[in-house]
Regions:
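Conserved PLP-enzyme active-site core in the AAT-like
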Residues: 2-304, 310-326, 330-331, 335-342
């Protein structure tokens, strides 16, 4: 098989699922009012309010970086400090976007086992942070759910972290690019890992889980909404034909495809993790698998036609494998067999 047929690079390499494409086609009939005043965008608040079991305000954007950076810019002034894990997407893969859109806010990066922050680490960092006119002012905590290392925060974890943040006056943001995978793993109501646990705003991802290009910024704290609306427009992320993004998000939720795709990718990742055995680096709780193979064994996998990203220190021969919603079962079985043979 060609390398493209055995790709485990990223869930971003996957296709858009039929339910999403059908929704776009349905929205592509006739005229609709522009800039979010269409009927599809008009339904987002109600649909997501039902999903989260509380009244929310939701805004469609096309990329996860826009969702994260504009959310954090809403939470932090230019002189603000945003506390996040050192492996977080906003720290490693967004080209300084939070600082750019906020006008200067800086990330304060913290360690944490398996990609997760602990309330003890956050509390210690906040306690050590000097507060006076000469320093950045603590403004926000950003968590990633599921994390960049394929692990998941439990509801109690988020509750403790949010409580520590709120006690110091910080708002709480969650990067939920793989939020569906976290929900599928926890099998809990969406509310339990968002507003009930103290989250103020969520970047609700769909693109990695079968959408074409669709993310929603979901506000549980409605006082933040007006500022965000203006920031989104000023940043060029208020789409004139918003109906096509909103239609994806509605289909993603209303058809239940979010759950179906996430459960499948989680299951495939679990299979890969079991095959990796002792080489596994982190618990497999979402759709990402990290293994430490050594340089020679990693190259042997690549020579066998498997596509994946190198990860971590080059000398350790680490690799990341990501399951997509449309991965053929036989490709996953082939990877599992190859890992077991190493």
């Amino acid at each position: 098989m060609a390398a493209d047929d055995l790709r485990f690079f990223s869930d971003n390499t996957g296709t858009a699922c039929p339910e999403i494409l059908s929704a776009i086609a349905q929205a592509n009939r006739g005229l609709a009012i522009a800039y979010g005043d269409d009927e599809w965008t008009g339904r987002l608040d109600a649909t997501l309010s039902e999903f989260f079991a509380t009244e929310v305000r939701a805004f469609a954007v096309a990329t996860g970086t826009a969702a994260n950076a504009l959310s954090l810019a809403t939470l932090s002034p230019p002189y603000g400090a945003i506390f996040a894990h050192e492996e977080s997407h906003i720290a490693v893969d967004e080209c300084g976007a939070p600082g750019f859109f906020s006008g200067g806010a800086q990330l304060m990066l913290l360690p944490g086992e398996h990609g997760r922050l602990s309330s003890a680490t956050l509390t210690a960092a906040l306690s050590a942070h000097r507060i006076d006119v000469h320093t950045l002012q603590p403004a926000a905590l950003s968590l990633t759910q599921a994390t960049e290392l394929g692990t998941v925060y439990r509801p109690a974890d988020i509750n403790q972290l949010a409580a520590a943040a709120h006690a110091r006056g910080l708002k709480v943001h969650v990067d939920g690019a793989r939020f569906a995978n976290a929900l599928a793993f926890l099998a809990c109501p969406p509310a339990d890992i968002t507003w009930r646990a103290g989250v103020d705003v969520l970047s609700f991802g769909a693109t990695k889980n079968g959408a074409l290009a669709a993310e929603a910024v979901v506000f549980f704290d409605h006082a933040l909404v007006r500022d965000f609306e203006l920031r989104r427009k000023r940043a060029g992320h208020l789409l004139s034909k918003s109906r096509y993004v909103a239609a994806q998000l509605l289909a993603y939720i209303e058809t239940g495809v979010w759950r179906r795709n996430a459960e499948r990718t989680n299951r495939l990742a679990q299979s890969i993790g079991r095959a990796a055995g002792a080489a596994l680096m982190h618990p497999v709780e979402a759709n990402e698998v990290f293994v430490r193979l050594g340089i020679e064994r990693r190259q042997a996998l690549r020579d066998a036609g498997f596509g994946f990203y190198d990860w971590g220190a080059e000398s350790a021969g680490e690799a990341r494998f990501v399951a997509s919603w449309d991965h053929p079962e036989e490709d996953v079985r082939a990877l599992c067999a190859a890992l077991a043979r190493l």
